Structures are given as structure tokens and as C-alpha cells.
Curated annotation (Swiss-Prot):
Organism: Serratia proteamaculans (strain 568)
Residue sites binding Mn(2+) 1 per the record: D257, H339, E384, E423
Molecular function as annotated in GO: aminopeptidase activity; metal ion binding; metalloexopeptidase activity; phosphoric triester hydrolase activity; proline dipeptidase activity
One GO process term, biological-process aspect: proteolysis
Residues annotated to bind Mn(2+) 2: D246, D257, E423
Protein known as: Xaa-Pro dipeptidase
Cross-referenced InterPro entries: Creatin/AminoP/Spt16_N, Creatinase/aminopeptidase-like, PepQ_N, Pept_M24, Peptidase_M24B_aminopep-P_CS, X-Pro_dipept-like, X_Pro_dipept
GO cellular component: cytosol
Length: 443
């Protein structure tokens, strides 16, 4: 197996190649990529948790240090100014020494403002990538070269195809997330609250709640009907009906994003519904291949949800085809099948069709689908079908021409369970699909 160092060198060579191309196309000499800056809380002396610029951590696995800078010209070694002040108030990261550091020119930056003296004097043909736009202008970057759209479109589009190094990092993130999921499931079985289940997850993964790639969704019972539920009750419910966990992990800046749903009672109708949705998710993934648009699989999943609604007698007296055509599946599956995954949880370029950034929106019928790409080898995506019992989405269907087809008594009996979501992370290969999640035997 190739070492992470050799994979990183190949990764860096690919990024250098992309940099040369995008610089030539846009008549630029170099890119100045900023890790970011701390953002102060209004009228306070504290800052919000730092979140690094994804374009920065694509080049180097530095994810928690603000005020760092990369100078990239596609030819020479990337220059990394690593922020390392003398500071007795706060802990300071030492200059890194790791598998990747010999591949860059590493220099300490004692003061954030010193970068102005470190950069070449001529900056008219330098593109800045980052969110501190005023800082870029203060450094003499021309306004049109601050986050130039053509540059970002090119880089975002190509970021969809993961290098071997990126895939290795994402597999490691999966391992960490799976450990957390197993610990959280044990906590659920022991009757813990949402808050304590989340603590068990963080302990198992070695993450702080500010380190996870997104806010953990730890939902018991009806809370699972809130798609992005993050409240975390401190007291467990009197009866544990269901548990939905949507939680991930990071490795070198790359994310895992996994979801599992469990029933409190193994013989319940809800438990059977979980089992059947799991089967449909696996069957759908058996059909996924390169060269097909992701949207097609989203539509196919609605057909599979219609099949479940019929077999569980939740919707009756109407064909599965008509259910999908008339939108009867949408209140039960209101979100998209999934999204690109990588440096960001909802990774870049889900709608981009080419290097120029041509946008293909989600179908109007499914506005919350996050990806319309043609699948290509090297892409990483989530596959996360769900079935929910959400009052606000079901309410409009309680009257009107299709109301008679909804088995409201059966649907209402499932509302205390909230809903189901099952999410795996897959890699598209030339002739197969790699399921990074199931490969680790996360049931």
C-alpha cells in the first residue's frame, strides 16, 4: 500500500497541474490562498470557532491555524507562511513536521501583519482566495483578482474528482466516524439522553463539538422528524421509540458524513420500515455507475419510497408510478438523495456541469437535491434516503383529491418515531462503486 506521503506528493502534483492551467487561462502569475482569520464576536473579546478555507486545506492539512498563507504558482514548491506568534495568552501551534512538510517551503509568520513584507512587491497579477476580502485589498490585490469567479469555478469543478491521497484521508475519516456511531448506539441502548449520546460520540471519535465537520444530529423519537435537529435534550424521553444519528468526522480536513436510524423495539412496524428502507438503499446503490446523472438516482429513490409506502399500507389505492408523478412521495422524502462530499460536507460543484461553472439546477419538483452532476470516476457522494413523518409537510395532503389515499391512522401512529435516514459514503470507480461506510461493517 502506498504511504500517505507518496499519495500526498501525487496529490500535490495534480494540484500544481490545475494551478498552472487556471493561472494561464486567467493571465495570473500566482494564487495567494489564505487559511482565514478569527472573527470577533460583537462587542466581545472572544472569537467564533475558527473554520479554515477549504481551498487552503486542499493543499496542506492545516485545519486549525488562522493567518496562514499559501503562495502557489504551479511550478515552484508552494510557499507556506505558518502563523506562529509569541503568545503567552493562547496555545500556539508549533511549526509542523509531518509527511507533507518537505513538499512545501515552510516559513514561520510571527505577526499576522508581517505577510505584507513577505510577499513579492508586484501583486497586480496575483489572485486571492479566501474570505478576508478587505485584507486582500490592503495587500494590494486588485479587486477583480479577489476570489475571481473563473478561477474558483475551475478549481471547484476539478475538486469533485478526488486524488488517491484524498480518498485515503476520507477512508480514515470513515473509520473514526464509525467508531463514534457504534459508541452512540451503545449509549442509546443504555437509555442515555441526546446530550449524553453526543458526548459518547465525541469521546469515541476524539473530536470536540467544534471539530466535527457539521453539528451532530442526535435525535430521539419525534425529534427525528426535524431534518437538522441539533437541540440535544439533557433528559431522555420516558420511552425510547427511535434514534436517528447523523454525525461525521474529519481526517486531514476531509469529511465523513454518516447516518443510521434504530428502533427502540425490534419487532415494531417502525423497525420493519427501517429494515426495508435499508434494503432499498442497498438495492439502489447496486445500480449506481459512472456515466449516469445523479438526478436519475434521486428519482429512482422516490420510486422505491413509493414501493415502501404501498407495501407498508401507508398510501393505498394508487399506483406507485402515480404516487411519484403526483408528488405523494415528497412529504415522506423531502430532501435530496445526497450530495458531493470531500473537504466540505456539502462539497463544491454539485450543480456545475463544466469548468466554466455552467449551472444545472435541481428539478423544480425536487428543489432540495444538492447534486445534478454526471457521475465520474473519482467522485465521492452520499447516498442518504429517508422516510419521515413531518406534520407541516403532511398537512397540505390531509385535504384535496389525494387525501383518501393516505392511511392517516397508520401514518399518525408513526409520527412519534419521527423518521428514518440511512446514509453511506460512496466512491465512483470506473467499473464499480466503493461503499466506504459498509466496508467497515456499519450495519
Amino acid at each position: 500500500m502506498e504511504t500517505l506521503a507518496s499519495l500526498y506528493n501525487d496529490h500535490l502534483a495534480e494540484l500544481q497541474k490545475r494551478a498552472r492551467e487556471v493561472l494561464t487561462r486567467n493571465k495570473l502569475d500566482a494564487l495567494l490562498i489564505h487559511s482565514g482569520e478569527l472573527q470577533r464576536i460583537f462587542q466581545d473579546d472572544r472569537s467564533y470557532p475558527f473554520k479554515v478555507n477549504a481551498h487552503f486545506k486542499a493543499w496542506v492539512p492545516v485545519t486549525s491555524v488562522p493567518n496562514c498563507w499559501l503562495w502557489v504558482d504551479g511550478v515552484n514548491k508552494p510557499k507556506l507562511w505558518f502563523y506562529s506568534p509569541v503568545d503567552y495568552w493562547h496555545s500556539v501551534e508549533p511549526l509542523p513536521e509531518s509527511f507533507w512538510t518537505r513538499s512545501v517551503e515552510l516559513m514561520p509568520l510571527a505577526n499576522a501583519d508581517d505577510i505584507a513584507q513577505q510577499l513579492p512587491a508586484q501583486r497586480e497579477r496575483v489572485g486571492y482566495i479566501g474570505y478576508a476580502q478587505q485584507r486582500a485589498r490592503d495587500l494590494g490585490i486588485l479587486a477583480e483578482n479577489v476570489n475571481p469567479k473563473a478561477v474558483l469555478n475551475y478549481l471547484d469543478f476539478h475538486r469533485s474528482i478526488k486524488t488517491g491521497y484524498e480518498l485515503a484521508c476520507m477512508r480514515e475519516a470513515q473509520k473514526t466516524a464509525v467508531m463514534g456511531h457504534r459508541a452512540a448506539h451503545e449509549a442509546f441502548l443504555s437509555g442515555m439522553s441526546e446530550f449524553d449520546i453526543n458526548q459518547a460520540y465525541l469521546t469515541a471519535t476524539g473530536h470536540r463539538d467544534t471539530d466535527v465537520p457539521y453539528d451532530n444530529i442526535v435525535a430521539l423519537n419525534e425529534h427525528a422528524s426535524v431534518l437538522h435537529y441539533t437541540t440535544l435534550d439533557h433528559q431522555p424521553p420516558s420511552e425510547m421509540l427511535s434514534f436517528l444519528l447523523d454525525a461525521g468526522a474529519e481526517y486531514n480536513g476531509y469529511a465523513a458524513d454518516l447516518t443510521r436510524t434504530y428502533a427502540g423495539q425490534s419487532g415494531s412496524d417502525f423497525a420493519q420500515l427501517i429494515k426495508d428502507l435499508n434494503g432499498e438503499q442497498l438495492a439502489l446503490m447496486d445500480t449506481i455507475k459512472a456515466g449516469v446523472r445523479y438526478t436519475d438516482y434521486h428519482v429512482q429513490m422516490h420510486q422505491r419510497v413509493a414501493k415502501l409506502l404501498k407495501s407498508h399500507k401507508l398510501v393505498t389505492g394508487i399506483s406507485e408510478e402515480a404516487m411519484v408523478e403526483q408528488g405523494l412521495t415528497t412529504p415522506f422524502l423531502p430532501h435530496g438523495l445526497g450530495h458531493p462530499l470531500g473537504l466540505q460536507v456539502h462539497d463544491s460543484a454539485g450543480f456545475m456541469q463544466d469548468e466554466q461553472g455552467t449551472h444545472l439546477a435541481a428539478p423544480s419538483k425536487y428543489p432540495y437535491l444538492r447534486c445534478t452532476r454526471m457521475l465520474q470516476p473519482g467522485m465521492v457522494l452520499t447516498i442518504e434516503p429517508g422516510m419521515y413523518f413531518i406534520d407541516s409537510l403532511l398537512a397540505p395532503w390531509r385535504s384535496g383529491e389525494f387525501s383518501q389515499h393516505f392511511a392517516w391512522d397508520r401514518i399518525d401512529a408513526l409520527k412519534p418515531y419521527g423518521g428514518i435516514r440511512i446514509e453511506d459514503n460512496i466512491v465512483i470507480h470506473e467499473k464499480r462503486i466503493e461503499n466506504m461506510t459498509r466496508d467497515l461493517n456499519l450495519a
